[in-house]
Amino acid sequence: MTLSVQSLAMSATAIFAGAAIYVSFVEHPARLSCYPTMALAQWRPSYRRGTLMQAPLAIIGAFLGLVSWWSGGGLAWLIAGLLIGSVVPFTVIVAFPTNRRLEDATLDGASDTVRQLLITWGRLHAVRTALSSVALLIMIFAGG
């Protein structure tokens, strides 16, 4: 049972990390190369859709990582589970203020504020990318 739980934890974390890496290194830089109005118009639906996929993956990866640790998988699984799980409170506490400003319908899409908010969002997303990637590496080296 532990191996299958570990495999599922690793799978959820890998999907999260892979998507986060893609956004950090491909999608968001491309978005920033557009005019702010277009970048914002692309960010909004992308963010909403990404949230529907990424939040459950982080929660599943964290839960199954903790189950793997609890089932005798070792301290590495606890650390990995906590790392991927920390993406959710990080997003809620640290990133949501920026997200909310970007989602604000009264935000002038042509303003310099949009570009600065998108740059800030990219930096915050890079933290999620790093947390999930480190969690995945720990899971891999833990033998999942």
Could you say what each language-model-derived stretch is?
Residues T2-A14, V67-G85:
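Interfacial segments of alpha-helical transmembrane regions
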Residues F25-P29, A58-G72, V94:
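Membrane-helix exit/interface motif
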Residues V94-E103:
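Functional transmembrane-helix hotspots
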Residues M139-G144:
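Juxtamembrane boundary at the C-terminal end of a transmembrane helix
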Residues V88-V94:
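Mid-bilayer segments of alpha-helical transmembrane spans in multi-pass integral membrane proteins
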Residues T2-I60, E103-I119:
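Interfacial loop at the N-terminal end of multi-pass membrane proteins
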Residues Q54-V67, R128-L136:
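Core segments of transmembrane alpha-helices
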